[in-house]
UniProtKB/Swiss-Prot annotation:
Residues 536-559 form a coiled coil. Residues 1-64, 841-894 are annotated as: Disordered. Belongs to the TRAFAC class dynamin-like GTPase superfamily. GB1/RHD3 GTPase family. RHD3 subfamily. It is found in: Endoplasmic reticulum membrane. It comes from the Eukaryota. Residues 790-792 are lumenal. GTP binds at residues 147-154. Residues 40-53 have a biased composition (Polar residues). This is Protein SEY1. Keywords: Coiled coil, Endoplasmic reticulum, GTP-binding, Hydrolase, Membrane, Nucleotide-binding, Transmembrane, Transmembrane helix. It is an enzyme of class 3 (hydrolase).
């Protein structure tokens, strides 16, 4: 919004003011001090210090850039100018008639700013000397007046301060004061500022100067007199409320915001409303309330800077009110009230005293010309005061309305496309649709808005175009995102489909996919980028190209990984049979056979990889790395297979088989049938020792050919090159000493069991039944056999039994018949027990019979109640007989 007024430089170094003026006599100073001591103190902070009473204390030594927080060294002896005691130091320094001699003639006035907004500061210092204020230091005040043209502002100032501003000729109402005039009040250290009136017919709608002059008065004066007629109170334009609103708004942003950010003290100004032609019908209190309400409403409507969001009107302005009767019709009353109002500017003891310490701007008098010039330059350069005329206001209002209507129609037309874009679709006609809807909105605006102020129309059209482009930007970005995703997927599909062909070149597939995707991107974005926009697609294009290359690298890595996995499967399959066969035939060349198979498989896999990797467009370094990884993987697979074949279970089985081949079979492979004459002990010891000798052979990978060992070391690499793959030295020890001892101990137990079994076989062969025993059985049983065969009844029964047994066996009815027989036996036993119990107890059978439940298969299930009965034993032992068979008894066939 603008610089803080405190930052406006006065001068690099102001010439020291001449204090060659004769000091007042000591008796005069003492008299003035005695007179001033009877005046009530000003409303200042209780902590402020009191300055020395000598006028020399006001002599400035150097002018520095204006800032309320900068110390003006030498301005006051030993005092900080930010201290209010400089301004309210003593009655001598703040009394209007003490610093300069009394003027008996009217002072010359100075046109500070002319009607063309030109600042005249060349004669300022000369006028200060003529007015006797060049040595005033801080002992001066500034008062300005604001009001409508021809309302008696200059007359009021002349009567209050004894100035000689031009007044209007009452015979013709026309502009009198042009620009801003400055004059010293007679016998007072007051600079009075007469400001050109507002709402004059000479300037018409051009309100630029009146806003700038009002802001200048508000920013520089301690007291701003707002001159108005009584019948203007409550009006917005007539009471200058519109002007005050603009001035207050710019004053906040231009002058006060910088102070708030810097932490400086807030400057306050007194707004003294002088109500002219007051007749008393409406009490002053009511008029005062109306004005206060209007000002509070204006303050609430201002857009405040961030640092002053919570600021109140009272933080920057105090309000004062005074009334004056009609100057012509009530001349005596007017003169009397002028004297009363005059005392408020003179009498420090008056409770309504105007020039209080907190209103002073803390600018020394010798730096005032530069300060005022800097403030005016800042106001002139500020664009916030260049407000439009009525025609421009109308054009702004109507153009805004038309632009809003066009924007709504545009948004409604574009909303239908949003859903499809959000769904991830690429709209081929989006560029044409956006251009068409934007052109329609601009045409709608041009049709109605082109009739208004052309400058406003052009500016608003540009604003509308910017707004429409901003509304289209999300569609543009969403289309780019969808296009990015679609082209990435398309390129991925092209590459993946190409890799499914029997013979393909991965590099050509990648180049083809990327070229096709980038061509489609360029074609679509050429239709998508609209004229009169600053849209660029360079970043999105570079991002898409990077992602496609990343995708190609990822797909190539996937293909390489799949190739490696397939080759590892082939290695596992190719290593399984040779290694297992070599380890199943333990001899001195066992590890030679294993490592030879390992080298053969490694060479085959490396050749297969190089052949198939040629189509993947891999680099030589990548091929070397992949082959090394495959070789390490093959070493891990070999170790895995070796450990599998030398596990405790497998190795124990293999040792047992090796032992049995030598113990249970002869040299020709014929199973041995042990005879008492065989030397079992010698055969056992030889077989056992030969088998135990295999354990150290399995325990360590130790080929007879040193070249095989060296080749494995070169393939596997050093231990630090791979943390996952063990080195040859780490992996060559297959079985630990403890594991070897455990396996040997287990084998010995199994061998001992085989030895004992063989020994038992020889003993059992010696203890067989003699053959002659069978002859004895035939001789002794001959008579019984003949008796059965010769007796028709026995023979018939024998035949029936044999026939029944044959049928049962033939029909596989043995189990059901046995189950039926068992069930009948249980039933008969239960029936017998029941009959016997009935006989012994003398109770009817129905009372003691257990409930029976028949199952579909014909078996009986007993569920008996626990009925106590007498013991059946004759020994008299007390038994609690209870039928506890609560579960069904099913046939044995179940």
């Amino acid at each position: 919004m603008g610089l803080d007024v405190d930052s406006v430089p006065i001068a690099e170094a102001a010439a020291p003011s001449s204090m060659a003026a004769t000091e007042p006599p000591a008796d005069k100073i003492a008299q003035l001090d005695r007179d001033a001591s009877n005046v009530a103190p000003m409303n200042t902070d209780s902590s402020r210090e009191t300055m020395p009473t000598s006028p020399r204390a006001l002599e400035p030594a150097q002018v520095t850039p204006l800032s309320s927080d900068v110390a003006y060294e030498g301005l006051v002896q030993g005092k900080d100018p930010s201290d209010d005691s400089i301004i309210a130091a003593t009655p001598l320094q703040r009394t209007f008639s003490t610093v300069a001699p009394t003027m008996t003639t009217q002072p010359n006035r100075l046109q500070l700013i002319d009607e063309d907004q030109q600042f005249h500061g060349a004669e300022f210092n000369d006028h200060l000397k003529q007015w006797g204020l060049s040595d005033a230091g801080f002992g001066y005040d500034i008062c300005a007046v604001l009001g409508s043209q021809s309302t008696g502002k200059s007359t009021l100032l002349n009567r209050l301060f004894g100035t000689n501003f031009d007044v209007m000729d009452e015979r013709a109402r026309q502009q009198t004061t042009k620009g801003i005039w400055l004059c010293r009040g007679m016998d007072r250290n007051v600079l009075v500022m007469d400001v050109e009136g507002t709402d004059g017919r000479e300037r018409g709608e051009d309100q630029d100067f009146e806003r700038k002059s009002a802001l200048f008065s508000l920013a520089t004066a301690e007291c701003l007199i707002v001159n108005m007629w009584e019948n203007q109170v409550g009006l917005f334009q007539g009471a200058n409320m519109a002007l005050l609103k603009t001035v207050l708004d710019v004053n906040l942003s231009l002058f006060q915001a910088g102070r708030a950010r810097a932490g400086s003290a807030k400057e306050k100004t007194l707004l003294l409303f002088v109500i002219r032609d007051f007749i008393g019908t409406t009490p002053l209190a009511n008029l005062e309330a109306t004005i206060r309400t209007d000002l509070q409403r204006i303050w609430a409507s201002l857009t405040k800077p961030e640092s002053l969001v919570h600021a109140e009107l009272g933080d920057f302005f105090d309000l004062g009110f005074a009334t004056l009767p009609h100057k012509v019709l009530q001349a005596k009353e007017f003169d009397a009230d002028i004297l009363k109002l005059q005392r408020r500017f003179i009498d420090r003891g008056d409770e309504s005293y105007v020039f209080k310490t907190e209103y002073h701007k803390r600018i020394p008098i010798d730096g005032l010309p530069h300060y005022l010039e800097g403030v005016w330059e800042q106001i002139v350069q500020n664009k916030d005061l260049d407000l439009p005329t009525q025609q421009e206001l109308l054009a702004q209002f109507r153009c805004d309305e038309i632009a809003t209507t066009a924007s709504l129609a545009f948004s409604s037309a574009m909303s239908a496309l949003r859903a499809e874009l959000d769904a991830g679709h690429v709209l081929e006609s989006l560029g044409n649709d956006m251009a068409r809807h934007r052109s329609e909105a601009l045409a709608m605006f041009d049709k109605d808005a082109s009739r208004y102020h052309q400058v406003v129309y052009a500016r608003k059209r540009e604003d509308l175009l910017v707004k429409l482009n901003a509304a289209l930007l999300p569609f543009f970005l969403c289309q780019l995102k969808n296009l990015h995703n679609e082209l990435t997927d398309q390129c991925k599909r092209v590459i993946q489909e190409g890799t499914k062909q029997p013979a393909y070149n991965f590099g050509l597939l990648v180049e083809e996919g990327i070229t096709k995707a980038m061509r489609a991107f360029d074609d679509e974005t050429a239709r998508l980028v609209l004229p009169e926009t600053d849209w660029k697609v360079d970043d999105e294009r570079a991002q898409l190209l990077d992602e496609l290359h990343t995708l190609a690298r990822t797909l190539r890595a996937n293909e390489t990984r799949k190739l490696s996995i397939q080759l590892e499967k082939d290695m596992r399959r190719e290593l399984a049979d040779p290694v297992e066969l070599a380890l199943s035939q333990p001899d001195i060349s066992m590890w030679n056979n294993v490592l030879s198979a390992f080298h053969r498989v490694n060479e085959q896999v490396a050749n297969m990889y190089r052949t198939r990797a040629a189509s993947l467009n891999t680099t030589p370094d990548e091929d070397t790395t992949a082959v090394a990884q495959l070789q390490q993987a093959s070493w891990r697979l070999l170790l895995e297979k070796v450990h599998e074949q030398t596990s405790e279970t497998v190795l124990a089985s293999r040792l047992r088989g090796y032992f049995e081949d030598r113990f249970r079979y002869d040299a020709g492979g014929v199973p041995r049938v042990w005879k008492p004459s065989d030397d079992i002990d010698d055969i056992f010891v030889k077989s056992r020792d030969a088998t135990l000798a295999l354990i150290p052979l399995y325990a360590t990978i130790q080929p007879d050919d040193p070249s095989l060992q060296m080749s494995v070391v070169s393939l596997v690499g050093a231990p630090e090159e791979s943390l996952e793959t063990p080195s040859y030295d780490e992996a060559r020890h297959v079985l630990s000493e403890r594991k070897c001892a455990e396996i040997g101990q287990r084998f010995r137990r199994e061998a001992d069991a085989a030895y004992i079994e063989a020994k038992r076989g020889t003993v059992s062969s010696m203890s067989q039944v003699p053959i002659w025993m069978y002859g004895v059985l035939v001789v002794l049983g001959w008579n019984e056999a003949m008796a059965v065969l010769r007796n028709p009844v026995y023979f018939t029964l024998l035949c029936m039994v044999l026939a029944t047994a044959y049928v049962i066996w033939r029909l596989n009815l043995g189990t059901p018949v046995l189950a039926l027989a068992s069930g009948m036996t249980r039933e008969l036993r239960a029936f017998g027990e029941e009959q016997l119990r009935t006989y012994l107890d003398g109770t009817p059978p129905s009372a003691n019979r257990a409930r029976e439940y028949r199952v579909p298969s014909g078996s009986t299930a007993h569920v008996s109640e626990k009925t106590p009965h007498r013991p059946l034993t004759t020994s008299g032992a007390a038994e609690a007989d209870t039928v506890e068979d609560s579960h069904p008894r099913l046939p044995a066939s179940f």
